[in-house]
Amino acid sequence: MRTEIISIGNELLQGQILDSNAQHISTALSQIGLKVMQITVLPDEIEAIVEALAATKQRSCKIVITTGGLGPTSDDVTKEALAKYLDCPAVVFSKERLSNLGGVDTPVIQYLERATNSSVNISDLQLGGIKNVLGTAPGIYCKQNNQILIVLPGVPTEMQAMLRDTVLPYLQSNFTLPIFYQKTICTIGISEEEIAAILAPWESRLPAPIKLAYLPDLATVKITLAATVPTWEESKRLVEEEFLRVLPLIEPYVYGYNTDTIEEVISRLLKSQKNSLSVAESCTGGYVSQLITQVPGSSVYYQGGIVAYNNTAKHKILGVARNTLLQYGAVSQETAMEMARNVRLKLKANIGLATTGIAGPGGGTIEHPVGTIWIAYADENTCYAQKLQLTNNRLYNIQLTAYHLLDLLRKKLQGK
């Protein structure tokens, strides 16, 4: 069943924002067995939208989901474009009239006649409004000539709620979707190329129904195994068998499964071990603390963080010895370890973490080029530091350092 996504908005094409909606929709659809075959990004222009919708019909696309252009401003033209594409009056898609519709699959003839005060001849069109509980712009459901159009707002929180609460349940209850089972392995500390090389012999022997996908991100790579076969039981059996074969090959790099994030895994470990945590940050400027506190309930184990950016702060606030800073410098194993030990004691935590280094793009020397970073871990019995040599990109260095540090913490908590 061919499915496509159309993302509408000048801001997407101008690079002002990322198209996170398409990513979210694609992920959600894949989890119910629908494969997105094409994603199109369009400007807020009626003709461009009409042409794109017409092209989906030429490609025999069964389901089209659009996002964006439902708001009240002059550049929100999706409803006008939809009316032109369906050859029906634009007043049909007014906010007031959509809000009065019961739901999807509403018989449309009488509705259209009431909306326009005239006789219409659109006997093959079904229309429904999709309730938007988080915003003011209702979504739109249209079915015509065996094609389903689902029109959603571009605001991510609104779109996600409507997709979850209305669209996905509708698709699952009204279509015979492919039966499939999938499992994702989440890795960190290894590149996509390195994983692919390790898995190549195993991958070459995969049964035909098994599909393998790699999803690299900043510091992680996710590997998804999926099988589409006549029964769910058979799909699960195939995936689980290959999962057990592949896991030992990359086990040192595995931090979780399916939708796990490294922060969530650490949260579970800290809670189960009744450990507490504190962080001293220099080059990461609080980013480690941000990641940790993104997890609900992190106050149970997270005591707090200290951003000590210059040497004065490192000495006066964290208590790093002047001699350490003078003899070894701020970017050193010795300073990183003192930061980790001292923040643990100052904030009365079981575990202390630290980052110090040169994020860039300036500040590097021959001895310590840009991207030279030290991360450290300290508990009651041990203290350990690790050197990283990263890139010239400041933001990348900050983010990657944080993930390296969280992975170091994970390994320590797991006794690795």
From Swiss-Prot:
The organism's place on the tree of life at top rank: Bacteria
InterPro entries: CinA (IPR050101), CinA-like_C (IPR036653), CinA_C (IPR008136), Competence-induced_CinA (IPR008135), MoaB/Mog-like_dom_sf (IPR036425), MoaB/Mog_dom (IPR001453)
Transmembrane parts of this sequence: none
UniProt-listed Gene3D superfamilies: CinA-like (3.90.950.20), MoaB/Mog-like domain (3.40.980.10)
SMART domains given in the database record: MoCF_biosynth
HAMAP family: CinA_B (MF_00226_B)
Family as reported in the entry's similarity comment: Belongs to the CinA family.
Name used for this protein in its record: CinA-like protein
